[in-house]
Design a protein with these regions (language model features):
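Conserved N-terminal beta1-alpha1 strand-loop-helix module at the mouth
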Residues: 1-60, 67
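Catalytic beta/alpha-barrel core
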Residues: 2-4, 20-33, 53-55, 70-101, ...
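Acidic (Asp/Glu)-rich catalytic clusters
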Residues: 31-47, 75-88, 104-113, 139-141
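Structural signal for hydrophobic packing residues in well-ordered secondary-structure cores
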Residues: 35, 39-45, 93, 166, ...
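Cofactor- and metal-binding active-site motifs of prokaryotic enzymes
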Residues: 50, 55-77, 184-197, 202-209
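Catalytic alpha/beta core domains of metabolic enzymes, predominantly
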Residues: 98-237
Length: 237
């Protein structure tokens, strides 16, 4: 279960009045309040692991936070989680590697028994293979327990390159790797577990059956289960 704190903050503050959350104070105050709702959601999920994310505008979210503000937010988040019972904490927190705070956050999270997902997003294109491999290596060096990349393809060749990078990284890195090519063109990468991607993201319909993807190209969870069953890969629980 993925919970994006900054998306919850947007809803709490009111989308019409605050189309882009830019005040760090408003964000942090609301995050601390929202965490109590996250704890309740985790309890209601009956043992389903919770991944906590704080996705800003640069990573496809809505909040406008600079690197310093992002680091402060993550420190506050972990300080708050320290007061929770270990069994109620999220199993992992997602940190954008380009923010520069991954080593600090990874060390603090490790003390709390919370895993760290190192993330890299590129909504403009698919970097060269060597650049993607360096990003994955950096996540490992800086303490990530899982290295995840999401990129935008301009062609089928870009998708194929990403799958190749994924396969090589999965075979050589000491931590699991997750990689996805966004948009309709990259959908195959979200269900092609045979190339080594350790996890994928799927959309769960709301009570009215409506589907709202958090990133372009995400598929409904039932379709993802069906694809994983056909193509190989452990179905989502």
């Amino acid at each position: 279960l993925r919970v994006d704190l900054l998306e919850e903050v947007r809803r709490a503050l009111g989308e019409e009045r605050h189309p882009r959350v830019s005040s760090l104070r408003a964000v942090t105050d609301c995050v601390l309040e929202t965490l109590t709702q996250v704890e309740a959601a985790a309890a209601a999920a009956s043992g389903v692991p919770v991944l906590l994310t704080c996705r800003t505008a640069a990573e496809g979210g809505r909040a406008s936070l600079g690197d310093a503000g992002y680091a402060v937010l993550m420190r506050l988040l972990l300080d708050e989680l320290a007061s929770w019972e270990p069994r109620r904490r999220p199993v992992a927190v997602d940190i954008e590697v380009r923010r520069g705070c991954l080593p600090e956050v990874a060390a603090r999270a490790r003390d709390l028994g919370v895993d760290v997902v190192g993330s890299f997003h590129d909504f403009e294109g698919t970097p060269a293979d060597a650049d993607l491999e360096e990003v994955l290596d950096r996540m490992v060096r800086e303490g990530g327990d899982l290295a995840k990349i999401a990129v935008w393809p301009a062609s089928a060749e870009d998708v194929a390159r990403l799958l190749g990078v994924t396969a090589r990284a999965a075979a050589s890195l000491p931590v699991p790797v997750a990689a996805m090519s966004m948009g309709a063109l990259g959908m195959i990468s979200r269900v092609a577990a045979v190339f080594g991607s350790a996890l994928t993201f799927a959309v769960v319909p709301d009570e009215e059956g409506c589907i709202e993807a958090s990133a372009p190209g995400q598929l409904p969870i039932d379709e993802v289960r069906r694809c994983l069953s056909l193509l190989g890969g452990r179905p989502i629980g």
